[in-house]
Amino acid sequence: NPRDLEVAITKKEAAGASEEELAVLRARLRRIDGMVESNPMLGLRGVRLSVVFSDLPLMQVRAVATAAARLIKEGVDPRPEIMVPLVSITAEHVQTREVIERVIAEVSAEEGVELNIPVGTMLELPRACMVADEIAHHADFFCFGTNDLTQTTFGFSRDDAEAKFIPLYMHKKILKDNPFETIDTAVLELVRMAVEKGRATNPDMHFGVCGEHGGDPKSIKGLFNVADVDYVSCSPYRVPLARLAAAQAKLEAEHSA
């Protein structure tokens, strides 16, 4: 907590601490204050962290690649995939992928094994869906983060919205469903459009959805039959329900074909 650190500095000043010790603490406080954001949900997170703090992806990718290489040596067949989150600009993904591929190549040479790790994009912003055809030139797969996509499509902060007005909106029939539980038609259309754009650019891509919508039967039906995604992922306790809903969606699609 930066304010606790501020109090600690004041106490040390009063106690006559050395300037050298105080300088270290003041520098730390400035660093922390410099990272505080007014709206962190739309601030420095996701791929933006990798762009600003360029060492971050180096460490993360090296850890994944090294673990995969060592498992291969042990006779295991690991299948890691690396997903770049919160992309909204194609160049964000392109530059980050260049770093990822360089690190994978380095680890492959160091460990003496061939590594084939797909690199995809997490689409969770409306702009990313609009330029999905551009991003698809540089991605092996798309996964839709529909929680954040819902937040940024509606302009809702989920925690605030669910606590303060979504129940009232549902009571007044402004909203039929909680859009964080059942995917909204406009959000579903963004997913459908992005899948269509991505598949037109790269027919070999696979498309998935992660988040709570991946465990909601009504959402699953739309995601498979309208948006045409390949899979959904969800929390473990929702897996049986999700598998049943996915099977029902497939049967409905085959029956109506």
Language-model features: where?
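Conserved alpha/beta-domain cores
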Residues: 1-257
